[in-house]
Amino acid sequence: MNKQQVIEKVEKAWADFHQAYNGLAPEQMIEPGVDGVWSVRDLLAHVSWWEDELLIHLPEILQGIRPKRYSVLYGGIDAFNALMTEKWAVLTLAEVQRKVMETHAKVITYLQSVPEEEFKSGSRFRRRILLDTYGHYPFHAKSIRDWREKTS
């Protein structure tokens, strides 16, 4: 895939993710149990903090810096997610929704600014994009769709 195709793939997966919760009332968005104890609001926050991580680590990767492992920094991905869940718990649904949209816009703007040659297949740069965007969103979209089907 070239740069434009990668961005289109990110945006398609993003739209599908948002479609999964489209039409939910605010009280449904904060109801726990969608994915473990997490609500849709929590899943939105989760996706957004991983996009924040993407914005931190993609520039490092392009500079040849290997980001430290989450196991070293936090004791693992689950520990990082728990820490971020606690950090984001103080935000209202509206604040989370605003942050989600702002962060995603920054991701797209950043990707558009990166030269085409950095999007080569198999690179650490491309793998990080996959892990934090179009490989990540569908997993949580499915959780939301499954929950909606189960609770309807």
Locate predicted features:
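Short leucine-rich amphipathic alpha-helices used at interfaces
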Residues: 6-7, 20-21, 96, 140, ...
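Short, contiguous alpha-helical
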Residues: 30-79, 116-152
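Solvent-exposed interaction patches of small proteins and small membrane subunits
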Residues: 1-9, 63-69, 90-98, 124-128
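A short secondary-structure junction motif
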Residues: 17-20, 24-27, 110, 114-117, ...
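Acidic/histidine-rich alpha-helical segments that form the ligand environment
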Residues: 9, 76-118
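Alpha-helical bundle segments that constitute or directly flank the non-heme di-iron/ferroxidase center
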Residues: 1-28, 49, 53-60, 135
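Short amphipathic alpha-helical segments with heptad-repeat character
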Residues: 7, 11, 44, 48, ...
